[in-house]
Amino acid sequence: MPKHSPPDTSPVARFEQSLQELEQLVQNMETGALSLEQSLGAYERGIALYRECHQALEQAQLRVRLLSDPMHPDDGEPFDPSLVSTSQ
C-alpha cells in the first residue's frame, strides 16, 4: 500500500494556498452569483486570507534582511529592480 505524503505546510506553501483561495474567492464574488450572505462570508474569509498573505510577505522580507546583514537588519535598503542587469 503506497504511503501518502503529508501536505506541505511550509510558509511558502501556505502562502501559495492562501493566495490561490483568495483569487478564487474574488473570482466567485465578481460573477455576482453569490447571495448576500454568501458574499459576506466570502468577504470575511477574503480578509482573513489577505492578512495571512500580508503577514507571510512581511516575514519573508524580514528573513531576507536578516540573511543580508544579520547584525543590522534595519539598515537594509529596499530592493530596486531597475538596478538589476538583464543582459548577459
From Swiss-Prot:
Broad enzyme group: hydrolase
InterPro entries documented for this protein: Exonuc_VII_S, Exonuc_VII_ssu_sf
Catalytic activity, as annotated: Exonucleolytic cleavage in either 5'- to 3'- or 3'- to 5'-direction to yield nucleoside 5'-phosphates
Compartment(s) of residence: Cytoplasm
MF terms (GO), sorted A to Z: exodeoxyribonuclease VII activity
Main location per the UniProt record: cytoplasm
UniProt-listed GO biological process terms: DNA catabolic process
Subunit structure: Heterooligomer composed of large and small subunits.
Record HAMAP family: Exonuc_7_S
Family: Belongs to the XseB family.
Function text: Bidirectionally degrades single-stranded DNA into large acid-insoluble oligonucleotides, which are then degraded further into small acid-soluble oligonucleotides.
Protein name: Exodeoxyribonuclease 7 small subunit
Species this protein is from: Xylella fastidiosa (strain 9a5c)
Source organism phylogeny: Bacteria, Pseudomonadati, Pseudomonadota, Gammaproteobacteria, Lysobacterales
Gene designation per UniProt: xseB
